[in-house]
């Protein structure tokens, strides 16, 4: 962290920038990372990795043969910038970006609800 405060840039998605500042080059607000594509919501189920969280989202799929809806889930690794600092149990919004690693192509852009508030 530097001494002076850098203004967070607008990422074009209508989300409020975080109050904290970071020096992460892969932060969409304070770094050089561009976001584009899908915007998803889910719950953080793991935050044990460094600057990475696993976001789980549930969705429903219709099975025509049995005429029923089945509940499915997907687990998406996402980059967690230090200025956002999402923790396990938080409801977050993630946005697609360029591939950051072999499995990470999403970044956390907003914490919708903290775990202790739920």
UniProtKB/Swiss-Prot annotation:
Gene3D superfamilies: 2.40.50.1000. Coiled coil: none annotated. Disulfide bonds: none annotated. GO terms for biological process: translation. GO terms for molecular function: rRNA binding; structural constituent of ribosome. It holds the Pfam family Ribosomal_S17. One of its GO terms (cellular component) is cytosolic small ribosomal subunit. SUPFAM superfamilies: Nucleic acid-binding proteins (SSF50249). Keywords: Ribonucleoprotein, Ribosomal protein, RNA-binding, rRNA-binding. It comes from the Archaea. Part of the 30S ribosomal subunit. One of the primary rRNA binding proteins, it binds specifically to the 5'-end of 16S ribosomal RNA. PANTHER family: 40S RIBOSOMAL PROTEIN S11 FAMILY MEMBER (PTHR10744), 40S RIBOSOMAL PROTEIN S11-RELATED (PTHR10744:SF9). Belongs to the universal ribosomal protein uS17 family. HAMAP family: Ribosomal_uS17_A. This is Small ribosomal subunit protein uS17. The lineage of its organism: Archaea, Methanobacteriati, Methanobacteriota, Methanomada group, Methanopyri.
């Amino acid at each position: 962290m530097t001494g002076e405060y850098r203004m967070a840039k607008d990422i074009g998605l209508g989300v409020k920038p975080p109050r904290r500042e970071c020096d992460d080059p892969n932060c969409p607000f304070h770094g050089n990372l561009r976001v584009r594509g899908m915007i998803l919501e889910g719950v953080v189920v793991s935050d044990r990795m460094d600057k990475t969280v696993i976001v789980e989202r549930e969705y429903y799929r219709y099975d025509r043969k049995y005429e029923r809806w089945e509940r499915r889930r997907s687990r998406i690794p996402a980059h967690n910038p230090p200025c956002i600092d999402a923790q396990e149990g938080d409801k977050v919004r993630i946005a697609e970006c360029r591939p950051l690693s072999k499995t990470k192509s999403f970044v956390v852009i907003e914490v919708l609800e903290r775990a202790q508030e739920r």
